[in-house]
A protein has these predicted regions:
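Non-catalytic, beta-rich accessory domains that mediate macromolecular interactions or localization
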Residues: 20-23, 73, 88-89, 97-100, ...
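Charge-rich, low-complexity N-terminal segments
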Residues: 2-44
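Solvent-exposed, charged interface segments at domain starts and junctions
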Residues: 1-18, 83-93, 141-145
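A hydrophobic, small-residue-rich beta->alpha segment in the mid-to-C-terminal subdomain
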Residues: 86-124
């Protein structure tokens, strides 16, 4: 099971790393992905859809915190897509039912993997998505931190 490295405030996801890129594409908004996909396709490169974007159920697995064992939390709806852009394959899986974002994300993934001329702009946008995602995570953590229970303090009061 792969650990979620982005949970650390210091970790900066690398859009050139495919695993990180998958996470960033999944977090990116549909309009941004579609815009980049359209720009990549402007030159009419050979494109074949290897997996049509269709919503599916996926078992979401988390790690149980006490014994650190995998735990099936439940099924979630995701939309995967896979393309071949020239000789390069691209894949994306986005949360929910969103065929356009999944197909666009797969095209974006292939473009970055192939070092398309739009790669610098795509990478910059994905890095900005990662920065926003980390900031949101820090805000959420700060808001929920005051609900932490200190069991040692509770035991001392009894």
């Amino acid at each position: 099971m792969r650990s979620f490295r982005c949970a650390s405030a210091e970790y900066m996801p690398d859009p050139h790393d495919r695993s990180d890129r998958f996470e960033l594409i999944a977090a990116c908004d549909e309009e941004t992905l579609a815009g980049f996909a359209n720009e990549v396709l402007e030159g009419d490169p050979p494109l074949s859809i290897r997996q049509d974007p269709r919503p599916k159920l996926l078992m979401q697995q988390v790690q149980e915190p006490v014994e650190r064992r995998p735990f099936n939390l439940g099924e979630v709806v995701v939309t995967p897509a896979e393309v071949e852009l020239g000789d390069t394959r691209g894949f994306a899986m986005v949360p929910g039912k969103n065929e356009r974002a999944a197909l666009s994300g797969a095209i974006v993934d292939a473009a970055v993997a192939a070092n398309h001329e739009r790669t610098p702009a795509i990478v910059e946008s994905l890095q900005a998505t990662g920065t926003r995602q980390r900031a949101q995570h820090r805000r959420s953590w700060a808001e929920s931190r005051h609900t932490t229970v200190d069991f040692q303090t509770m035991e001392e009061q009894q």
